[in-house]
Each structure stands twice: as structure tokens, then as C-alpha cells.
């Protein structure tokens, strides 16, 4: 007998993701003007208010208020009725300098021996059930919300959409861990109050709410989902869609009050959405707002890079990689591998881990250089997942009244590149 597995995603307009995007926009601006910046930027967003806090060591000077407002505007919070709007919200900064104790403990004369910025364990995971080596349930949950955001921005259909939204996808697997069908899809989307009651009675209000919900449900099934399906080019995934899927659309009913006005948002509160949707494991450290000296971020990217290349090379159908560090120490304490009994090589998981240790330099500075992490590449990671995205080179422009304007070409999602497959095949004689 098989089993059901569920993953969720949240949109760029979800309050926690608004906070993540502001934190990473601050990080990007600082790295653009001073690549050696040490940054730990936390953001809180609530009704009409943004609060920035954290520790920074940098030679750059940036306009934090302007950065926050630009992010909020890009997401789509541009109307006063949202009670959180890019031009009118307050922006308070409580950012201060990084502790010199931490800096002394991490910096080294030889940059390659730079110590880890903190202790902790980080995980990378990959599975061959999708073309991007991600869990299918999470991949679909992200895709639904990305298409929903595209529809909102186009403004041609579903014109009542507001920025805040969530999705959840439940997949049925057989006993061999193969997806066999999509069981349930949940979509909750914030919307305008686009049908007004005929009078002030409770019955009239209920009728208007039910009419709105009926329209939203119809549009999700007849407009959103066909576009989601059209964006999929994998026959095995397309075969999982059928007319027996259970849809829960705005199951609590009316969803007009949302975003930071409906729920306070904080940086780092969607770490499972950011990674593997509950598959694999998570060490607990968030990503957004942290420069790559923080192994919470850089080592998690490195572990994903390893796991993805190992699965793509055919070492296993599924793999979890753990690395751990002590603060101020460059080399990882351990590398752990779990292939879930789905390995294709005649080795124990411990032996696989030892070969990984030989193939990949996991010192923080080596990770930074291999994955080009000292570049302004992070705002793009802060919505719809840090993993499973498409590596690409883009041109980014930064404007500063203090530092002048700057244009840089950067490579996004370098940890998703399959650039170690050939080396791995040689090492494992595949």
C-alpha cells in the first residue's frame, strides 16, 4: 500500500516572504558595492510598518528605506487599502555593527582557512522524481503560485487578485516511492472585496461572500490550473493530473485582509518552503539576509549542489547530505550521506561520504569561490524556493545616491549547476 506526502509554498506577497525579500535586497545592495560585506539582516513587516534589525560590517553606504520600499512596490503592495503600501509604510532601522568577537574568531590570514561563521548542521537533498531533482509536491506548489503571480501582474483575468497567497499539494506514492497521482491541491489567495452585499444584513453579506468564493474557485480550476499544466513539459508529471483531484480553494471563505496587515511577517520563518518541502531534512538555520560567511546559507547550498550532482550522475535515485561546522573552524566536522536504500553503487553510505569529502572542498571560503557567492545574487532566491531553480546569468543594476550607479553581470543559482557529474562518474566508476 502506498502513501500520501504533502508540501506547501507561499507567494512573494506572503508576509514572511516580504520580509525575506527585503533582507536579501539589503544584502544584495551591500554586496554590490562591497563584496566583502558581512551581513545578518532581519526584517519584520506588519500593518504600515517595516523594521530592519541585525548586524553589518561593510564599507558601503546604502539607503535602507529606499531598498525596502522598492521591494514592497515590486511585490505589488501599492494600494492604501492593503494597509501596507510601498510609499506610505514606515521604515525603521535598528541595524548595527557586527560583533568584533565574531569577526576575530572567523577571519584568518589565509583566506581559504576562514572559519565558519557559526556552528550548526546543514542538509542538501535531491531526488530524481522531477527534472530539477526536487520533490514533486513542492515543485508543483511553487509552480502554482508563480503562475498565479504572473496572472495577477498581467491584470487581464482574475483581476481581483492581491499579492498574498498559499498553496499545498498532496501526492500519492506507491510502495517504491514513485508518484502515481495528485490527490489534493489547496490554493488560498487574497482578493479584492469585488462583490458588495445588497444591504447590511448578515444574509446579504454571506451571499456576496459565497458568490466571490464561487468565482475564485471556478477561476482557479478553469484559468490557473490549465496554465500550470501548460507550463509542465514532463509527460510523467502531466499524467498525474486528472479530474479526480480534490481542490480546496480559499477553504476559510473570504480572504480580503492579508499580507503584513493580516499577519506579521519575519525573516526566516519559511525554511521548509525555501528548501525541500518537508522531504530530506533541515538543520534549522534560515537563509535570507545572511552573507555567505554564514554556513547556514552557503553550506546548505553546497550540500544541495553535492546531492543534485550525485543523483544526476546515477549514484542514487535519492540522496541526503549533511555537513556540520564549529564556529571559527574552516573544515567541516562531518559529512553524512543517506541514500534511503536507493543507491546504485556497491558502497555503504559512509564510503560514499568519504568520496564526497575528496571531491568537494567544503571550507566556507572554498564554497564561496566555487559557487560565486560573494555576488548580489540573493533577492531572486527569497521567493519560490532557493533550490530547484534554473541557473542563469543576468545583468543587475544598482542605484545609489551615495555610491554611484553600478551594473554587474551575475550568475544566479550556481548550486543548481550539474557541473560535477562527470567527475562523480569517474570517482564512482559509473
Name what the model sees in each region.
Residues 1-40, 45, 421, 427:
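N-terminal, positively charged regions that mediate nucleic acid binding
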Residues 6, 66, 73-257, 388, ...:
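Glycine-rich, mobile lid/loop segments that gate access to catalytic sites or pores
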Residues 8-10, 14-19, 115-130, 256-281, ...:
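Conserved phosphate/anionic-ligand binding catalytic regions in large, soluble enzymes, centered on
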Residues 12-31, 129-149, 290-314:
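Alpha-helical support elements that line or immediately flank enzyme active sites
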Residues 40, 51, 92, 122, ...:
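Structured core elements
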Residues 40-58, 327-331:
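Short, charge-patterned binding micro-sites
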Residues 46, 316-318, 325-430:
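Internal helix-turn-beta structural module
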Residues 269-271, 276-320, 331-338:
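C-terminal catalytic subdomain
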